[in-house]
Amino acid sequence: MRNLKFAVLIPAYNEEKDLPHVLSRLPCEKKNIIVVDDGSNDSTAAVAAKCGVTVLRQGKNLGKGAAQRRGFEYLKDEPYDGVITIDADGQHDPALIPQFLKKARDGNYDIVVGTRVLEPGTAMPLIRLLTNLTTSLVVSLMSGQRIRDSQSGYRYLSARVIRNIPLTTSRYQTESEVLIKAGRQGYRIGEMPISTIYSGQKSNVNKFIDTMRFIGLCIKSLWG
């Protein structure tokens, strides 16, 4: 069985500090790495370009989901079997990418979600933990497939998922939207544990507004 041909997509907003370290550790050629700069106020785009990867720039900050959609649109006609999405802040270990690909290939999964396991001595902020547990339960019920970490940004998506599933959201709810739609359409969703380190950096999530957006997504999905 042949290895999967893949691209790496990194949405980035004000990540000039951590992005170079992430890019240097990716186990693939630079031509297969796409960074979407989501209207950063710092030198994120310049730093990415200096590293020799493809950079797509949003004119203003439109949200993580919008950045992912821009990347998917760019990649959907390219000759890849799938796409790895990974966050730009260094919380995810790029060395796990081969395991994502093996899981997808051996299990015939269209999506593989990285289920976060905390490193010893670190802890997920309580509000983030409770929010993730709740949203994961809701997404599991709505998608018809068990998903323990619906908010994880580290995942594999097959080419047919990014080509065939239309996404309409623009913020953090996009990661839930693709799981709900994929599950309902019969795409196979798998999971694998990933190590995660929280270094105390400030989250870009607005707890109230993004919760309202998630609720709106759920209501729309129920009637969709």
Language-model regions, residue ranges each:
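Acidic helix N-cap motif at the loop->helix transition within catalytic regions
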Residues: 17-21, 42-51
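Short beta-strand-to-loop acidic/aromatic patch adjacent to the donor-nucleotide binding site
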Residues: 80-89
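Acceptor/aglycone-binding surface of glycosyltransferases and processive sugar-polymer synthases
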Residues: 58-77, 94-172, 198-223
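Catalytic donor-sugar/metal-binding loop of nucleotide-sugar-dependent glycosyltransferases
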Residues: 146, 167-170, 179-196
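Cell-envelope/extracellular polymer assembly enzymes that use nucleotide-activated donors
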Residues: 5-7, 177
